[in-house]
């Protein structure tokens, strides 16, 4: 086993030559990187220093945003009238922005995004109610809803998510957030007044009817 790499990323060892070729294999990696599982053949030369460069890939992440909302799926008719039935379903056409919730720093210490910087604008959910942002550096992010689908209320909700290192054998970190929105609602008020005096009158009874087809 060779010593760990130093500040320059180098490690060396002196061995007695008992064969022409040995192999070099990475055992562990610095935090934030993926383990290189390849074995490198190294040909030994007496009295010479043989060099081998091993390059590690940084662990990256993907972030998926899911959108749910109530959809009219039916109606129940009773003696008291009609009550609508709503079901929570996936929603398309929701729009989101992603921001850095803290400085986003690569594994080698490079600052990729400063805190509050815009990482991606205009992420829009598809027919499956989701949208995915790939190739993110590990760190803390904020997802903010910019626009809700038709008939749903956009409150400008924000959610924070931390994409953390998952170990040297995990190729990609997967993270997700789910947004749920209330449907837009309407209320109808009816007031009964005397035509001449404009006083409010008790006892009036009214029915509310559909002016056109209401479809689920």
Question: Would you name each region that the model predicts?
Answer:
Residues 1-216:
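Solvent-exposed loop/turn and edge beta-strand elements of beta-rich ligand-binding domains
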